[in-house]
Amino acid sequence: MNVSDDYRSNWESYWRETSEERGDAIWDSDPSLTAEPHSELLLPHADTGRVIVDLGCGNGTQTRYLATRFARAVGVDLSDAAIDHARRATAGPSVEFEQLDLTDTDAVRDLHGRLGDSNVYMRAVIHQSEPAARPAVATAVAELLGESGRAFVVELTSASRDVLQRAAAGPAGPPPKLRRVFHHDLKPAAAADDEIPRLLTEAGLKILATGETVLPQTEHFPDGTRIDLPARWFVLARE
């Protein structure tokens, strides 16, 4: 299957209207708050000599950090506009980017064929994917791992919806970066808590470790407190 035209269009329009400034996207947090601590959870299980594929890489902020911890990093995203952002911000042979629809089974299989068994980093992709597409996204993780790769997957929990609703209910309405998410009809924290581990295991993945965390955002409540969204992380291998 492939994602719907509306879903693809929403992400294209979002990234076309996003500036080159770090943090303009609400989830574009500094790697010291995201990919760095996530890498520390993945590294005990992963071979750093393998490539790591950043699924849903956006403008590549986390991908560029991952390239400092692994032999090579490849960022992929559904949005051509996001990949354009990532390429403009990146220099060096250890990082590259390409457009990829994770629900396109043949394209994912082709990427695995080119890279071999890879490590995978996926931050907050399944939770906002269209319901019919979520199994294919989980399957893409398994396909890219092959027999030897390891994955770090972190997804928002249902508690994030309460945080987002509280942020949107301020006297002035949603803060600007969150308002832009709603304007483009993106749907954060849409998956049920039990759906994520079920999809991962149904895709043939084994959970090696899991825990609770938050995903810091680049937006704030009216009182200046940073918006941190509750999430659950998983370190995974193929069964």
Stretch-by-stretch model annotation:
Residues V125:
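Hydrophobic adenine-recognition pocket in adenosine-nucleotide-binding enzymes
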Residues V120-Y121:
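A conserved beta-strand element that flanks and buttresses the S-adenosyl-L-methionine
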